[in-house]
From Swiss-Prot:
Gene Ontology biological-process annotations: L-phenylalanine catabolic process; tyrosine catabolic process
Ranges in coiled-coil conformation: none
Gene: hmgA
Subunit structure of this chain's protein: Hexamer; dimer of trimers.
Cellular component GO terms held in the UniProt record: cytoplasm
Names of the cofactor(s): Fe cation
Keyword DNA repair recorded: no
Name this protein carries in UniProt: Homogentisate 1,2-dioxygenase
Pathway assigned to this chain's UniProt record: Amino-acid degradation; L-phenylalanine degradation; acetoacetate and fumarate from L-phenylalanine: step 4/6
Pfam families noted in UniProt: HgmA_C (PF04209), HgmA_N (PF20510)
Binding site for homogentisate: 360, 381
Lineage: Bacteria, Pseudomonadati, Pseudomonadota, Betaproteobacteria, Burkholderiales
Top enzyme category: oxidoreductase
Amino acid sequence: MNMLAPTAKNAFTPASLDRPAYQSGFGNEFSTEALPGALPHGQNSPQKAPYGLYAEQISGTAFTAPRAHNRRSWLYRIRPGAVHLPFEAMAQGRFHSHFNEVPPSPNQLRWDPLPAPAAGTDFIDGIVTFAGNGGPDAQTGCGIHLYAANADMTDRFFYNADGELLIVPQQGRLRLLTEMGVVDVEPLEIAVIPRGVRFRVELPDGDARGYICENFGALFRLPDLGVIGSNGLANPRDFLTPHAWYEDREGAFELVAKFQGSLWTAKIGHSPLDVVAWHGNLAPYKYDLRLFNTIGSISYDHPDPSIFLVLQSPSATPGVDTIDFVIFPPRWLAAENTFRPPWFHRNVASEFMGLIQGVYDAKAEGFVPGGASLHNCMSGHGPDADTFEKASNSDTTKPHKVDATMAFMFETPAVIRPTRFAAESAQLQAKYFECWQGLKKHFDPSKR
């Protein structure tokens, strides 16, 4: 029996999977129930929970983490999360956390989009690990993956014990049915699923493609705004967390876990998406990138790309993040006497980029939606020859709008190491370096 239950926030109101309901705010202390009175009053773990439910806490940080950074939620579910048969190791596929398969290269790298997968490929089977650093054992670094899928996960569920998942759809919508509610996400939106939260994925459009950043380190948070002030960039109110929803199904199901870089499988006799109510501040959320409040120069020069920071995973070093998630959205460029595209750069950090739609303003061609690029530590990069010539001779007395585009970047202080699949992929563009070879010598010591 598939039970589509009503949800509640302060008041009990019915809801439908046709239109999932959300709660607004980033990192808020939420309370939501899919049956009236399912949340215990005044305590977390009563002797007997309402409706015969089990109380279970899921912790995303240490018990003793400072209150401002402590993340946990209490779940009230039909069966505890421990109810399943033992896990067995799966054969290693293309989704993993093994980043020492091949030596990393200082070359600039760029890939075409993944080809369409074989029929019947669900979201988990469609994930391909492209690169990463650090590892889940040390709880630092990230895994970078691409996915291409064409089948729903109906009787299969997944959770990631290694890190939280930042999902960036590029083509096709995703319906993320999680323990804590339903999240619908489309291209130009992102979703984050916390470490350990179980879910399955449906594909409303039949096919889907996109990117994933797997965060092994500290949870993603909003960056401090400093002198920008109290508003700007990604505003907290625009992050949406689902209301409680559950399904009460029994059958022969599979639970897949990612643990210490490898996949494991277990048989489970019921759907683990059976949380009838929950409260806390650790939960899935989504964000519409089109709502990003872009900051830029209105006088001269192109500011550092940190002005486009959406989410960060902080490290122990002040001012240095384990991962920065940055976007390059539609925006007006108004700086006068300025080379307006992103400038030439050699960076101590490493940059993995993807393109959701349109054209990236530093690359006239070759970098296409669904593709990716990697510029590792101190690898020179920047606008291609065509972009440089055009921008160097454009009229900067008039504002110009970069429109119908959305590129993004996962930036890390550690070198991003491609996997064997990525290094040997047919999608790797062997002639990427040629985009800079047409840059001409303009130097003339007799002219200033």
